[in-house]
Amino acid sequence: MSIIDERKAALLARVRDYGGPLNELPVLAQFLAQTMHESGGLRYVREIWGPTKAQRGYEGRADLGNVKPGDGKRYMGRDVIQITGRANYRALTAWVQKTFGAKVDFEAKPELLESPEWLGIGAIWYFLTRKGLIDYARAGNIEMVTRRVNGGLNGYQDRLRWYDDCALKLLGFGTVRDFQKSAGLVVDGISGPKTRAALHEALSHVRETPKTEHEPPVMSKTAPVSDARPGKSPPIKKAAPAKTGSGSAGFLLGGLLVLIGAKIDALTAWASEWAHWAASFFN
């Protein structure tokens, strides 16, 4: 398995096990779009260290909690949305321990944030604890989600492209044209505000999982039902509260099974349908 495939599987597992509202399809599309941009498509899960002038400035920064010699480099940015500084590693540790009962200490072992066992947890923490971020994601407000993640609109066009790709694949469509035709939009292959609004609306109404990339899911005006399932992340005392539709849970489980090459004899029809489709999600 390639390092990228390993990271794909790890990120999917973290979202399933710890993501809570991130498992709602409209929110999941926003989350994946931001993490894919921030990590360069999962190529970078640790800050590239020079050190640059800015990185040398990490040393001794009280606002980052870097109070000991070497803290600047030791607590460099890690994860698919980078967590930087001793204070943030400590805060993340406290949140994971309190929320999930997990025995982990990112302050003591900062490299865990880039490990397969914990990759993605920092990004999940960021999304779940930043005021208004989940609400903006639920509303399909890509601009405000970007501002909350980035502080501005750096790389905004690339984030939009990632959103298009993630939303289309979550919905089971191969191209923008395919979706536009199905949604009754002008078929020009260009994803603009109207197409993205329609993508968000469709994600909000998914009630059945697609069987293949060419068989889009059925839309419904009813909310997705709860369908949480156990995971294989590090042991936790309690699962994160989640509101997930069968589409989201199936996507995560099916994607994980395919990506890690798991062989389970008793796969249900529900999971096996997703396994084939989800293999192409990040391609």
Annotate the PLM regions.
Residues 171-219:
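Short acidic, glycine/serine/threonine-rich helix-capping segments at coil-helix boundaries
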